[in-house]
């Protein structure tokens, strides 16, 4: 049995004589080749068995290796022994050896595999169970090893069990081997019987050709001798007469009548055959676009069949049916159909033949195209009677093809059609079947190239039309800002184009290459991007075309915008240097954007030009710069915006097509002016939005370019009470906080100062109460403040780099303006002459004839750099950032110049609510005394050494020191008899010096014990009113002047040359009394006399308020 392992002891080995039933020799069988017919061969079988397969073994239909005892058979020796089959057998020992060798190899691999598994030497040892048996190492690696060993043992055990079964079976396989031999013998005999039958049949067939009829010598002899055979009957046929032309014509007319009558009265003519004509003895049926068929009859009987005469095809390209076998076969087939099925059967056969012929012609044309110009782009396949042509084969995505086949049923839109099969076209475009009625498919004039061009033209028209519809919905094209035109053609694909205007000066032509289907984009005047402009073999879907056109339009728009702004000095900012992605703040429809920055701007602000098919926009983007240390390091880098974080972004214009308008009709500087203005306005609006407590209009999202690229104004609600505490000015107590300005201030952008590289803002506001005098009083030297002629509105100029807010400066200026207006109102109420006004000072005139001039300064003390503070820091502060400081100045000829420091201290006193009234009262009260002192000190007629020094303690306390006599006098203001008066007393140690007795005696006579106009002696001093103090000071000085003249005449006393230096002044202050005590005294003296000066003397006199004046 082939494939069964036989034991050598029973199969394939020598047999004992007792085991052979036919007494065959027990020697090994001779190795001879015997075929199935019993013929012995000469070639010896020298095949060697390897692993159960015989080298050079033959198949079942070939010779079989057998063993026979002898070449011939002798009947006296009995029947021959059956051929013994050994093909496919191999020794059992070979299988055992191979199994053992395989087991050894697998065991070696197992050992190698187990050695590669590392077992941890310090595995966790579980505790000993109660039975005392240790479970051993239970680590996963050790368990894996054990599992592999068990699997190997089970597998090999199963294999050796199979070997054991085979070994037991092979010891009893002798009977099976004999059965195999018997079966082989029966098969050989059956095959020999079948071969005999085949040979008999072949012989019978071959003998047919060898048959020869017996010769009819009698008939042959009669024919040769008499020329006829009497035994053959004469049918009586006569030879036809020669047919003349007239007879032929007559017979043709007769046939015509027969055919006409038959077709008109008897035969059923199918609808396609109803167009016919009878002529020349035949009927010619015309099937439009297919063929002309000539039929005729052979008998007059109405039931006789028509016979085929000729056929001519009416479509092109076509050819006549060649004479010969094809024509004869066609004649037979048509006549058979006419005989069996009449005219209808004939039409059905020829109609199907023509349709198949047309499909074949189209197939040949398509193959020729695929081998020629359309190579690699067409795929042609003929399935039964359906032609499939795939075009644009190299395109990715959904495929497109056409199917031309025979379709049964009624034609669409043909009422008269009787359901005859026709040549139909099926169009699958991008994987979807579409209507093919618009395809130019002429079944009469077959042209595959024309059909393909029509199909491709319709496909391209569909793509471009869909692209046009999508793009025309975008705002740029829908509103007519950009032109869009689609040129479509249903027959010629090369004439299908989409013309799109990218910018004012650039246009794009979109077409699709007919053969390959590649998108071709060509820009005019020049290609923008080679990767975008060249043809692409990617899938030409509508979305892809729209995407590429949109991308090119955005590239063109940004190119023009970038080239324009670079001329204006803008620099490009790389988005890669920013920490955050700018696209996060931009709408998702933005396809391209570019970032720009101007050197005049703050680094925290940039602009972005964005472009999409819905419109082009300018954006203002706010950046958060790194820390101060990082910023200083970045200053050395070329990219100053690196590592900046994007905070916010707002659109400022929905188009920058005006860039071309500016370039054509205006100067480039206008664009820089507009963008800088929008950056500046947005910086201030963003600052106000972060403050949250100050309302403004319009909101950030509405701050956009107005008509004519005008920068919008910012309306800010100004109300001091709603301002953050840090931005509220701390006014001196003497300046009343009164509202003068209406609560809406308009901040407008007024250009750029190119020299100082700053943006000019103008804040426009209105006053609650008009003051007509303001317009003429504003100083022309200060251009930061202007009042309208009616005096009801004002304008304040503010300067700052673009991107830095002026909000703090605005609120500071407005509050300073209110302070200035408060001072103006006070001076006007006091009927003082105001000469000029500005935010920093108020100049006025006073005195009896308004001959004295004074300037009141409005200064500012900043606790920190408020311009650099973040709004969050401002909101977090509870203390004010700005302190308003008032000062007063006099010219060098004004007698009040000595007390301007003291007056400034009074103006800025934190608790003196009547400081302005106090200063006005002091100016009026001290003017006579100051003038007298000024007259004495300004007497330069004599070149004398200095004899008098005047030390100003405060506005109400003066120290008069006569150097020659070492005498000091104190002139103070105090209350006397219910009114404010001047009091003169001697100050210092009551020591007697040279000449002092004489002076004191003279002073007692002329001052202390005397009375005068407006003054009165007190014994140890003098009290005088406002006007009387002039006489007191003059008499005092006259006494010292007369005493000096007497001393110089007698020569008794030498003048003291020592002057009172600053140290003496200081010692004198410390020795007598401090300034605060003196001021308190002065205040108590003035309080009962003037209600307006009730608290004017409660401020300290600083050291710088003391003026030392030396009299020459």
Curated annotation (Swiss-Prot):
Protein name: Mediator of RNA polymerase II transcription subunit 14
Family, similarity comment: Belongs to the Mediator complex subunit 14 family.
Stretches with biased composition (Polar residues): 20-39, 1088-1099
Chain's gene name: rgr1
Task performed by this protein: Component of the Mediator complex, a coactivator involved in the regulated transcription of nearly all RNA polymerase II-dependent genes. Mediator functions as a bridge to convey information from gene-specific regulatory proteins to the basal RNA polymerase II transcription machinery. Mediator is recruited to promoters by direct interactions with regulatory proteins and serves as a scaffold for the assembly of a functional preinitiation complex with RNA polymerase II and the general transcription factors.
Domain of life: Eukaryota
Single annotated GO MF: transcription coregulator activity
GO cellular component, one term: mediator complex
Subunit structure: Component of the Mediator complex.
Ranges of compositional bias, category Basic and acidic residues: 64-73
Gene Ontology biological process terms from the UniProt entry: regulation of transcription by RNA polymerase II
Major location (coarse): nucleus
InterPro entries in the cross-refs: Med14_N, Mediator_Med14
């Amino acid at each position: 049995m082939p494939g069964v392992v036989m034991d050598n002891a029973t199969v394939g080995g020598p047999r004992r004589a007792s085991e052979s039933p036919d007494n065959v020799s027990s020697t090994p069988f001779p190795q001879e080749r015997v075929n199935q017919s019993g013929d012995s061969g000469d070639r010896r079988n020298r095949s060697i068995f390897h692993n159960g397969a015989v080298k050079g073994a033959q198949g079942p239909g070939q010779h079989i290796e057998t063993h026979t005892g002898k070449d011939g058979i002798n009947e006296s020796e009995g029947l021959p022994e059956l051929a013994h089959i050994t093909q496919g057998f191999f020794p059992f020992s070979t299988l055992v050896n191979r199994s053992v060798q395989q087991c050894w190899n697998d065991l070696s691999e197992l050992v190698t595999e187990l050695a590669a598994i590392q077992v941890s030497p310090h595995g966790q040892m579980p505790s000993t169970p109660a039975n005392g048996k240790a479970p051993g190492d239970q680590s996963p690696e050790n368990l894996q090893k054990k599992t592999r060993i068990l699997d190997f043992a089970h597998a090999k055990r199963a294999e050796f069990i199979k070997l054991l079964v085979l070994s037991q079976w092979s010891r009893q396989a002798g009977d099976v081997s004999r059965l195999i031999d018997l079966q082989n013998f029966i098969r050989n005999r059956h095959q020999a019987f079948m071969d005999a039958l085949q040979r008999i049949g072949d012989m019978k067939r071959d003998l047919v050709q060898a048959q020869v009829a017996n010769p009819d010598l009698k008939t042959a002899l009669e024919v040769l001798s008499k020329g006829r055979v009497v035994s053959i009957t004469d049918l009586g046929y006569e030879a036809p007469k020669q047919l003349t032309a007239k007879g032929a014509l007559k017979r043709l007319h007769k046939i015509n009548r027969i055919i006409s009558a038959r077709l008109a009265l008897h035969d059923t003519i199918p609808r396609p055959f109803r167009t016919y004509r009878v002529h020349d003895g035949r009927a010619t049926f015309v099937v439009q676009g297919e063929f002309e068929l000539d039929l005729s009859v052979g008998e007059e009987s109405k039931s006789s069949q028509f016979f085929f005469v000729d056929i001519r095809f009416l479509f092109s390209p076509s050819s006549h049916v060649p004479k010969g076998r094809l024509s004869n076969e066609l004649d037979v087939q048509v006549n058979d159909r006419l005989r069996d099925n009449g005219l209808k059967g004939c039409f059905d056969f020829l109609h199907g033949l023509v349709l198949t012929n047309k499909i074949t012609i189209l197939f040949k044309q398509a193959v020729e195209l695929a081998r020629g110009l359309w190579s690699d782009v067409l795929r042609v396949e003929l399935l039964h009677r359906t032609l499939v042509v795939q075009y644009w084969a190299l395109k990715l995505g959904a495929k497109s093809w056409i199917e031309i086949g025979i379709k049964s049923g009624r034609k669409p839109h043909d009422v008269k059609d009787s359901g005859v099969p026709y040549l139909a076209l099926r169009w699958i475009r991008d994987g979807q079947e579409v209507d093919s009625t618009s395809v130019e498919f002429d079944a009469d004039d077959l042209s595959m190239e024309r059909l393909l061009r029509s199909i491709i033209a319709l496909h391209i028209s569909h793509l471009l039309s869909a692209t046009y519809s999508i793009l025309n919905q975008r705002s740029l094209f829908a509103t007519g800002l950009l032109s869009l035109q689609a040129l479509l053609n249903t027959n010629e694909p090369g004439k299908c184009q989409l013309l799109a205007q990218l910018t004012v000066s650039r246009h794009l032509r979109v077409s699709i290459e007919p053969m390959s289907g590649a998108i071709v984009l060509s820009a005019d005047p020049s290609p923008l991007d080679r990767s975008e402009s060249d043809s692409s073999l990617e899938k030409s879907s509508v979305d892809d075309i729209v995407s590429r056109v949109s991308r090119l339009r955005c590239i063109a728009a940004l190119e023009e915008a970038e080239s324009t702004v670079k001329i204006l000095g803008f620099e490009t900012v790389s988005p890669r240097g920013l920490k955050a992605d700018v696209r996060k703040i931009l709408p998702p429809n933005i396809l391209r954007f570019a970032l720009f920055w101007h050197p005049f701007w703050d680094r925290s602000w940039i602009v972005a030009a964005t472009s999409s098919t819905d419109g082009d926009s300018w954006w203002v983007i706010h950046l958060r710069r790194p820390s101060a240390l990082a910023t200083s390091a970045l200053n050395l880098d070329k990219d100053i915006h690196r590592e900046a974080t994007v905070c916010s972004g707002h659109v400022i214009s929905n188009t920058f097509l005006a860039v071309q308008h500016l370039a054509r009709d205006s100067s480039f500087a206008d664009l820089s002016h507009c963008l800088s203005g929008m950056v500046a306005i947005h910086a201030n609006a963003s600052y106000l939005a972060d403050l949250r407590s100050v309302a403004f209009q319009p909101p950030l999202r509405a701050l956009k370019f107005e008509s004519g690229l005008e920068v919008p104004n910012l309306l800010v609600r100004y109300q001091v009470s709603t301002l953050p505490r840090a931005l509220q000015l701390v006014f001196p107590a003497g300046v009343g906080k009164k509202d003068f300005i209406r609560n809406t201030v308009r901040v407008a952008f007024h250009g750029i100062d190119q020299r100082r590289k700053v943006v000019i803002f103008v804040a426009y506001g209105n006053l609650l109460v008009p003051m007509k005098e303001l317009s003429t009083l504003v100083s022309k030297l200060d251009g930061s403040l202007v009042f309208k002629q009616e005096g009801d509105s004002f304008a304040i100029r503010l300067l700052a780099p673009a991107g830095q807010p002026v909000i703090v400066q605005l609120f500071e200026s407005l509050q300073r303006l209110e302070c200035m207006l408060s001072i103006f109102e006070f001076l006007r109420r006091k009927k003082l002459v105001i000469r000029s006004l500005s935010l920093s000072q108020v100049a006025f005139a006073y005195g009896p004839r308004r001959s004295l001039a004074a300037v009141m300064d409005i200064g500012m003390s900043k606790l920190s750099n408020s311009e650099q503070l973040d709004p969050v820091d401002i909101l977090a502060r509870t203390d004010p950032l700005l302190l308003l400081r008032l000062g007063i100045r006099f010219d060098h000829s004004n007698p009040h110049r000595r007390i301007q420091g003291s007056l400034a201290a009074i103006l800025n006193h934190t608790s003196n609510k009547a400081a302005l009234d106090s200063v006005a009262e002091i100016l009026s009260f001290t003017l006579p005394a100051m003038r007298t002192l000024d007259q004495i000190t300004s007497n330069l007629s004599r070149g004398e050494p200095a004899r008098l020094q005047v030390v100003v303690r405060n506005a109400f306390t003066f120290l008069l020191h006569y150097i020659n006599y070492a005498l000091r006098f104190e002139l103070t203001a105090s209350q006397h008899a219910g009114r404010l008066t001047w009091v003169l007393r001697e100050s210092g140690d009551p020591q007697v010096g040279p000449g002092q007795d004489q002076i004191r005696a003279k002073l007692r006579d002329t001052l202390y014990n005397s009375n005068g106009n407006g003054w009165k002696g007190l014994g140890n001093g003098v009290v005088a009113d406002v006007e009387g103090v002039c006489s007191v000071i003059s008499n005092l000085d006259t006494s010292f002047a007369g005493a000096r003249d007497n001393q110089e005449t007698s020569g008794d006393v030498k003048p003291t040359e020592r002057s009172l230096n600053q140290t003496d002044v200081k010692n004198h202050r410390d020795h007598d009394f401090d300034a605060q005590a003196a001021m308190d005294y002065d205040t108590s003296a003035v309080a009962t006399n003037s209600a307006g000066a009730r608290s004017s003397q409660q401020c300290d006199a600083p050291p710088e308020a003391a003026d030392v004046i030396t009299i020459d």
